[in-house]
Regions:
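Glycine/serine-rich phosphate-binding loop and adjoining beta1-alpha1 elements at the start
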Residues: 34, 46, 52, 123-213
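Glycine/threonine-rich flexible loop motifs
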Residues: 56-61, 124-129, 137, 274, ...
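Rossmann-fold NAD(P)-binding glycine/threonine-rich loop
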Residues: 142-168, 312-363
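Adenosine-phosphate binding glycine-rich loop
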Residues: 162-164, 168-202, 335, 341-415
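An N-terminal-biased, well-structured beta-alpha scaffold segment characteristic
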Residues: 44-150, 154
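A structured beta-alpha segment of the ubiquitous adenosine-cofactor-binding alpha/beta core
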Residues: 99-112, 120-121, 268-318, 361, ...
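Glycine-rich phosphate/diphosphate-binding loop of Rossmann-like nucleotide-binding domains
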Residues: 50-86, 200-294
Length: 415
């Protein structure tokens, strides 16, 4: 019996010891977890948005709403005073959202880890970039090779929002599509502003008015936005695209797809990032013949055709303008790349000798600065979410990620 009592006592002592050891371990792990969490909180990224210096640019890369979301990720947000004024966001609105308003651009660039902008940096802004600092903006690397090389040499990282690959997973970061959507919508509004009649047909006591006829050339993101807006305003809408796979989508929106009496196997749009491929000379002639047939009938033409790495193709020629009715309008969304219309002058509105207005503005998104800033800042926020997956204040530049690799044009002193 004495031996049994001893064994029981020993067993109880071991159990008690193990229990206290487990409790002590639990307490220790909780303390270390809290310490890690506290340490993680102290490592915050500083994200700043300067005022755009490009003349006439009204957009801003951070809005009060996007700043709130970024702060939930553990980041600190900064803006230069007046950065959002032209888009309708006051300094007070930023301060109410917990954003630090900095008096000068120079002070902001020195303070932050990440600079978020809309336009490519100016020469002065590029010089302000520091080693280890990250720039996120539209950049157009083919047009800014010298700046790209300069920033890479400095050891800065550059993420070009215009280089985000057009794949399903990257749609939330696709700033080009966001801006093209706005441009397509605004093109129709701008056309209506210069067109002297109703879009929708009306029957009144004063007489019957036919609906406007609108032709949209190119059914990419901008083209589809223009088609949707035109249809919703009541116009009879036609659309043309060299990619036959978009016909069903166009027709589902209430527009009529313009088919050519010509057979040519076109490259699938998915293989060209959603853009049109170069057509054969025979296809082009058939295309132009169809446009000449439509020119006397349509009141408004909106052209959106672009080919990657090339000047915009000339699709609406001078003789087609001459065949249009006086008071008609052409809006050329490809004006920045030379234009689809013969008479287009970049950033200007011209009137032909027969009274056709040709609009070549390139700042349609900036003309809707509040909406454009809201969408663009959301694209930026999603990019930052992918760059900081651990929410620990550390940028994880995963070059095995298709989206991050595709958008990064300078990193670790390499282009």
């Amino acid at each position: 019996h004495a031996a049994l009592d001893l064994n029981i006592a020993t067993f109880l002592a071991l159990v008690t010891s193990a229990r206290f050891g487990f409790v002590a371990y639990r307490k220790l792990t909780k303390v270390s977890a809290r310490a890690r969490k506290k340490r993680r909180r102290t490592e915050t990224l500083k994200i700043g948005t300067p005022k755009e210096v490009f003349e006439g640019e009204a957009r801003v890369a951070m809005t009060p709403d996007s700043a709130l979301q970024l702060q939930k990720l553990g980041h600190e947000c900064y803006v230069e005073t007046g950065a959002g004024a032209m888009a309708g966001f006051s300094d007070a609105a930023y301060e109410n959202a917990g954003v630090s308003v900095v008096k000068t651009a120079a002070a902001l660039w020195k303070e932050v880890d990440i600079v978020a902008k809309v336009r490519p940096p100016s020469d002065t802004e590029a010089k302000r970039m520091q080693k280890g600092q990250t720039l996120i903006s539209f950049f157009y690397p083919a047009q800014n090779e010298d700046q790209m090389a300069l920033l890479a040499k400095k050891g800065s990282t550059v993420i070009a929002m215009d280089m985000v690959p057009r794949i399903s997973r990257a749609q939330k970061m696709d700033a080009l599509s966001s801006m093209a959507n706005i441009a397509g919508y605004r093109a129709v509004i701008e056309a209506g502003n210069n067109f002297g009649r109703f879009f929708t047909g009306q029957v009144t006591a004063a007489g019957k008015m036919p609906p406007a006829k609108v032709l949209v050339v190119g059914a990419g993101v901008a083209g589809l936005a223009a088609i949707g807006t035109s249809v919703s305003l009541g116009a009879v809408t036609y659309a043309f695209d060299v990619r036959p796979e978009v016909a069903e989508q166009v027709e589902s929106m209430g527009a009529e797809f313009v088919y050519l009496d010509f057979e040519e196997e076109q490259q699938d749009g998915a293989a060209t990032g959603g853009y049109a491929a170069v057509s054969s000379p025979e296809f082009r002639e058939a295309q132009l013949a169809k446009f000449r047939e439509l020119a006397p009938e349509v009141d408004i033409v909106i052209t959106t055709a672009l080919i990657p790495g090339r000047d915009a193709p000339k699709l609406w020629l001078a003789d087609m303008i001459a065949a249009m009715k006086p008071g008609s309008v052409v809006v050329d969304l490809a004006a920045e790349r030379g234009g689809n219309c013969d008479l287009t002058v970049m950033d200007e509105k011209v009137v032909s000798t027969n009274g056709v207005t040709v609009i070549g503005y390139t700042d349609f998104p900036s003309r809707m600065a509040a909406q454009a800033s809201t969408l663009y800042s959301t694209n930026i926020r999603h990019m930052l979410t992918d760059l900081t997956p651990e929410k620990d204040g550390v940028i994880h530049h995963d070059m095995e990620d298709d989206v991050i690799r595709g958008a990064t044009i300078a990193h670790e002193k390499e282009v």
